[in-house]
Amino acid sequence: MAPKKAPAATTEKKVKKAPTTEKKNKKKRSETFAIYIFKVLKQVHPDVGISKKAMNIMNSFINDSFERIALESSKLVRFNKRRTLSSREVQTAVKLLLPGELARHAISEGTKAVTKFSSSSN
């Protein structure tokens, strides 16, 4: 048997990588309404729980509702040739999007929340 040859010397040198200054991509946190949905659920039905799938559905529903209200409000502002979105446009959008008693209840709760916020910030 012939003796094994040593591998040929390579002329390539190992290239050291320069230290990178790039930051690792942080995971983007998605904000949900889950804690608020849970608080309302416990106010209405203290002994009832909610599954993760149902919570995701409720979160999507709230996001969709807010998006529709914002879109309708912005259309009303543009239609009236104004530059400022006020509570009046939001109330009108709610009246257009929600049926009857639900719209009246939503408007009264919204007005109550705005009044509470205004009085606390003064």
UniProtKB/Swiss-Prot annotation:
Post-translational modification comment from the UniProt entry:
Acetylation occurs almost exclusively in the MAC.
Q: What does this protein do?
A: Core component of nucleosome. Nucleosomes wrap and compact DNA into chromatin, limiting DNA accessibility to the cellular machineries which require DNA as a template. Histones thereby play a central role in transcription regulation, DNA repair, DNA replication and chromosomal stability. DNA accessibility is regulated via a complex set of post-translational modifications of histones, also called histone code, and nucleosome remodeling.
SUPFAM superfamilies documented for this protein? Histone-fold
Q: Where is this cross-link: Glycyl lysine isopeptide (Lys-Gly) (interchain with G-Cter in ubiquitin)?
A: K116
Q: Which residues carry this modification: N6-acetyllysine?
A: K5, K42
What UniProt keywords are attached to this protein's entry? Acetylation, Chromosome, DNA-binding, Isopeptide bond, Methylation, Nucleosome core, Nucleus, Ubl conjugation
State the GO CC annotations: nucleosome; nucleus
Q: How does it assemble?
A: The nucleosome is a histone octamer containing two molecules each of H2A, H2B, H3 and H4 assembled in one H3-H4 heterotetramer and two H2A-H2B heterodimers. The octamer wraps approximately 147 bp of DNA.
Q: Which family does it belong to?
A: Belongs to the histone H2B family.
| MF GO annotations | DNA binding; protein heterodimerization activity; structural constituent of chromatin
Annotated region Disordered: the residues are 1-28
Q: What is this protein called?
A: Histone H2B.2
Q: Does the keyword Nucleus apply?
A: yes
Residue positions, PTM N,N,N-trimethylalanine = A2
Query: Its encoding gene is what?
Result: HTB2
Q: Where in the cell is it found?
A: Nucleus; Chromosome
Query: Low complexity: which segments have biased composition?
Result: 1-10
Q: What is its main location?
A: nucleus
Matches recorded under PANTHER family:
HISTONE H2B (PTHR23428)
